[in-house]
Regions:
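Hydrophobic helix-coil surface modules that form long, contiguous segments used
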Residues: 31-36, 43-205, 234, 427-429, ...
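Long, ordered, helix-rich scaffold segments
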Residues: 258-259, 263, 371-372, 378, ...
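Cleavable C-terminal sorting propeptides in eukaryotic secreted/cell-surface proteins
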Residues: 830-855
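C-terminal GPI-anchoring signal of eukaryotic secretory precursors
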Residues: 809-839
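Long, intrinsically disordered low-complexity tandem-repeat segments
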Residues: 773-800
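Glycine/proline-rich low-complexity spacer/linker segments in large multi-domain proteins
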Residues: 3-55, 105, 110-113, 442-462, ...
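Hydrophobic alpha-helical and helix-loop surface patches within well-folded domains
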Residues: 89, 120-388, 519, 526-539, ...
Length: 855
């Protein structure tokens, strides 16, 4: 079939990109076919299950280069076109159309050391970035080798190219043998921050994992895209960890992936991982992060050895073909049976509620504190309240892999909670011992406890927080603050759990709770309670800040650098003097020598904090640097001023394109709206100068301006003012979902203040004190390096006791101690089962009488 097409500029199909080199615009042709844009490039049956072999021939100038999925096998002159040649590429294996890659450019290649991999590995960049391709060329082949060993399946192609594209829509695209990246997701140099370098290695690992999950075995249709993206997200932590073990990425999974999607999947607007109907082009946090979290949970209860062998079976059986989720569950279940892992039901039935319905369970644990201590464990769907009604299926119940422990030097107890809403659990703990469920937060659910258990946990954290694993410390904080925020537990409980933070030195627990603490800081900022809040937060942050210090050292561990970023932001927010003085000194030196190099990890912070703690001279310097360099860093820093006259001037400059570029006005206004001083002034500016704004900027910015103001507003008068603003300009702001969402945020803030402001204020007057004494810091920090053995899957006996969906549950509690470091998922489970005595009706009555949770 003959056809003719053109290179488009829409970043889809086979398209034209460009960049500037030495003042000259250079062009290249590249591709992005996912999900359904191969049809834009060439005639085809553009569906993932309609796989084919592709023989690609690309024409180019002799001085240019071309690349595709497969190695080049020949070059011939183009007849009648002197100076042009055809490049012939080897035929691909059978693959989906969306994986086809084509590129013609003046790029240069940086080859990897052949000793790192049996596969030819190159990084393709524009010439000026070649020196910055070394990191990718070093870690890429090592990650590929790791995955070959991990899966037990060889990479089937002869080469792998990683190409840095100047204009690229997604972050990266897993074309088989020719992965395309945004430049910032592949390039590492002396100006790359620690967090950006981590992102680079994770994205490389993510895309290389796709060479098996997505490319070798492809989902049958887009409604199962999580089979591609969930696995790639989960496995990126393994691949990246194999080359950067000091990043402790398996710990970071909890805060970077799991806890984030726990929020997304608790909204009314969420959707299942698998759609019953055909829905293409769904690439969001559910497919990626919930998919990864559910896969991680499955690996945990199967055991990592069984899980890996099952993946080998899945990849081998479905190679060069397509799969649906049942294919995955069936092969994993087959492997579980071979390995002696007995499941309480078919794996497909166990996993169906997790993949085919929305939300997840809240596990509520209520202990009896009587001899033969036990607990009533209930499950209920966790959905954040909204004013738009609830459309979820209330009858969903989950098979829940429960894990719990009272001593993190022992293997945790493991048990299955059946598809019942209540289960009686026999605990090994005595009444004066805490119990923590969801060990290492391996399960995709939240946990709430009775008040007595919370108090014992809080005491343990203060006495020696290292006796509780790092992921569980993060889980306790995250779950408690989310539950308190929606009035499931008292804020006193959540705040009690923060008391130990003055001893916490690990990045992950702090990162887990800082966003929630920031919300409290915003809500209380203009309230009488803010003085006590600031005193309390200073008592927590100061030791953390002193531990990491202001100055960066070449010997700093990766997580120390990330911790310092958080500690500095809070230290200067709280006006801790050492931080403020260091900022002023560094900013003054920068004003004296504008080309002075600042650490990339601290540069943006110093610019922002320098303006925040400065006066007019510091702001004027930032403004002049913005004008001279078009720097977003200086632009954002300008919005941090605490001088009202400067805020007023900056708002006025937004209306003059010679002062603030038109494309930057949204950044200026939204960041001013996040400024405690700027929020009120920005709102007044919007109300008073609406017509001037419309004349200067048009109407396209108003919805963004309106929404950005809402997050800090928490008074009924403010809500009424915003409603009036919407109604006065209904032709622009009316019928906007974004505007209504903003008004909903204000209502939520008002309700939160009504429910919690006074309670938190009372707590802050005299923060409760746990009776246990902290260990010495040296002991505490040593304990944090002792990790909990990961959960082992066991066979559980489940006996139905009534028609009210209550069951008794027995569990296996191996008592072997271990001091080995925690692994991402467990080894093959033991077969021992300990049958516990039946729990009596007296037990049930005692549990039901202890209800700390708000109805």
């Amino acid at each position: 079939m003959g056809f003719t097409s053109i290179l488009n500029d829409k970043l889809i199909g086979f398209y034209r990109s460009s960049y500037v080199e030495n003042g000259v615009t250079k062009y290249l042709a590249t591709s992005d076919m996912e999900p359904a844009d191969a049809r834009v490039a060439f005639p085809c049956f553009d569906e993932p299950e309609m796989k084919a072999r592709f023989s690609i021939i690309l024409g180019r100038k002799e001085s240019w280069k071309s690349s595709s999925n497969m190695p080049k096998i020949g070059t011939n002159p183009i007849e009648g076109m002197p100076g042009y040649v055809w490049d012939f590429f080897d035929t691909t294996p059978v693959m989906s159309t969306y994986l086809v890659a084509m590129m013609v450019s003046e790029f240069v290649s940086t080859p990897s050391d052949p000793a790192l991999s049996n596969v030819e590995f190159r990084v393709l960049t524009r010439p000026e970035l070649q020196k910055d391709a070394t990191y990718a060329a070093n870690v890429g082949p090592r990650i590929l080798e790791y995955f070959e060993t991990f899966f037990g399946v060889a990479y089937p192609l002869a080469k792998e190219d990683l190409a840095a594209i100047p204009d690229f829509g997604p972050g990266a695209m897993e074309n088989w043998g020719h992965i395309n990246f945004r430049e910032s997701y592949l390039i590492v140099n002396e100006n790359t921050t620690a967090s950006s370098k981590q992102r680079v290695v994770e994205v490389i690992a993510h895309e290389l994992a796709h060479m098996w999950f997505g490319d070798l075995v492809t989902m049958e249709w887009w409604n199962n895209i999580w089979l591609n993206e969930g696995f790639a997200r989960y496995l990126q932590y393994f691949g990246a960890d194999s080359v950067e073990p000091s990043y402790k990425l398996h710990e970071q999974f909890v805060v970077n992936t799991l806890q984030r999607v726990l929020v997304s999947d608790s909204l009314d607007s969420t959707h299942p991982m698998s759609y019953p109907e055909e829905k293409s082009q769904v690439f969001d946090t559910i497919e990626y992060d919930k998919g990864a979290s559910v896969i991680r949970m499955c690996a945990n209860f199967l055991g990592m050895d069984t899980f890996r062998r099952g993946l080998n079976r899945y990849l081998t059986r479905n190679a060069y073909s397509n799969a649906v989720e049942e294919d995955l569950w069936n092969t994993l279940e087959e492997q579980a049976a071979i390995d002696g892992v007995i499941l309480p039901d078919s794996l497909a039935k166990i996993m169906a509620p997790w993949t085919q319905t929305t939300n997840y369970p809240l596990i509520t644990v209520k202990r009896t504190y009587i001899e033969g201590d036990g607990a009533l464990v209930t499950q209920s769907r966790f959905v954040l309240p909204s004013g738009e009604g609830n459309s979820v299926q209330e009858d969903t119940v989950w098979w829940v892999p429960l894990t719990y422990s009272h001593d993190f030097s022992l293997h945790p107890t493991t048990a299955w909670m059946s598809t019942a809403t209540r289960t009686l659990v026999s605990l090994a703990a005595t009444s004066d011992q805490w119990v923590i469920f969801n060990v290492n937060q391996a399960g995709f659910y939240r946990v709430a406890y009775d008040e007595a258990n919370y108090n014992m946990i809080a005491d343990q954290l203060i006495a020696s927080h290292g006796h509780i694993s790092i992921p569980n410390r993060a889980q306790l904080l995250d779950d408690a603050f989310v539950l308190a925020k929606i009035n499931k537990i008292s804020y006193n409980i959540a705040m009690d759990l923060t008391l130990y933070l003055k001893y916490e030195r690990e990045y992950v627990p702090w990162r887990s709770v800082l966003d929630e603490l920031d919300y409290l800081d915003v809500m209380l900022h203009n309230e009488p309670q803010y003085v006590d809040w600031k005193i309390y937060m200073t008592s927590l942050v100061t030791p953390y800040y002193n531990h990491v210090g202001f100055q960066e050292s070449e010997s700093d561990a990766h997580l120390t650098i990330l911790s310092r970023t958080d500690a500095l932001n809070w230290a200067c927010k709280l006006k801790i003097d050492d931080c403020v003085q260091n900022v002023k000194s560094q900013y003054a030196a920068l004003m004296e020598q504008p080309d002075m190099r600042l650490s990339p990890n601290q540069r943006d912070f110093i610019l922002r904090a320098g303006v925040e703690n400065g006066r007019r001279a510091e702001w004027d310097f930032a403004y002049e640097q913005y004008k001279a360099s078009d720097s977003d860093s200086f632009l954002i820093a300008m919005t941090y001023t605490r001088e009202s006259s400067i805020v007023y001037d900056l708002l006025g400059k937004m209306l003059d394109p010679n002062s603030i570029r038109s494309e930057d006005v949204d950044k200026v206004f939204t960041n001013l709206a996040a400024n405690p001083l700027g929020n009120a002034m920005a709102l007044d500016f919007l109300v008073q100068r609406w017509n001037d704004i419309e004349d200067a900027l048009g109407t396209s910015h108003f919805v963004t301006f309106f929404r950005s103001l809402c997050d800090r507003l928490n008074k009924q008068t403010q809500y009424e003012q915003m409603v009036k603003l919407r109604d006065d300009h209904f032709d622009i702001l009316g019928n906007s979902t974004t505007v209504e969402q903003g008004l909903g945020v204000i209502q939520t803030n008002i309700e939160w203040m009504s429910a919690n402001q006074l309670e938190i204020g009372e707590w802050l007057k005299d923060p409760s004190t746990a009776t246990a004494l902290p260990t010495t810091e040296a002991t505490t920090e040593a304990l944090t390096t002792t990790a909990l053995p990961t959960t082992e899957a066991t066979t559980e006996a489940l006996t139905t006791t009534s028609t009210e969906h209550t069951s008794t549950l027995t569990s296996s509690t191996p008592s072997t101690t271990t001091t080995t470091s925690a692994t991402p998922a467990p080894t093959t489970p033991s077969s021992g089962v300990i049958i516990q005595p039946y729990l009596s009706l007296a037990f049930l009555s005692a549990v039901l009488g202890q209800w700390v949770f708000r109805q």
